[in-house]
UniProtKB/Swiss-Prot annotation:
UniProt superkingdom: Bacteria
Protein name: UPF0266 membrane protein lmo0779
Family from the record: Belongs to the UPF0266 family.
The keyword Transmembrane belongs to this UniProt entry's keyword annotation: yes
UniProt xrefs under Pfam families: DUF986
Bilayer-spanning residue ranges: 8-28, 46-66, 70-90
Compartments it resides in: Cell membrane
Native source species: Listeria monocytogenes serovar 1/2a (strain ATCC BAA-679 / EGD-e)
Entry keywords, A to Z: Cell membrane, Membrane, Transmembrane, Transmembrane helix
NCBIfam families: PRK02913.1
Chief subcellular location: membrane
One cellular component (GO) term of this entry: plasma membrane
Amino acid sequence: MVWDATNIFLFAANILTVLYILYNDAVIPLWKGKTVLSVKLRSRGRWDGYIFVGIIVLLFVSNTFFREGPFSTSVLLGIMGVLFIYICFFRSSKAVFKESGLFYALLFFPYAKIERMNLSEDGVLVIETNRQRLMLFARSEKDLEKMLAVFTTYS
């Protein structure tokens, strides 16, 4: 394996991507106590995923067939493509509700720090903390009712 700057960057990006997947799918459900509710949210930015995976595929094809680049770079690009296909198309964003707060976008927000909540007409639950605004795009009205029930019970 050739350890040039490109391969080091691709290797580090693949390791960080695997750590992200493990944290999101294995650590968050077990961390900060028992999971009260886990709700899958509507996906936003699906086209961003198509574009990003398309760029990785173009880099892979260019490196492998047209440039005849190092095999190790092709392998690392292939691994990155598989990881991002999983992230963009098979994994869905979710909000994980615990007894003391919720995980959203990899961060934990305690219920005590929530200042106000608003519900829009199109099913978006807007949660305002002292520093930021969270927008939870519920997939269905039942999911929205479940989220509101958890908020009324635990906050």
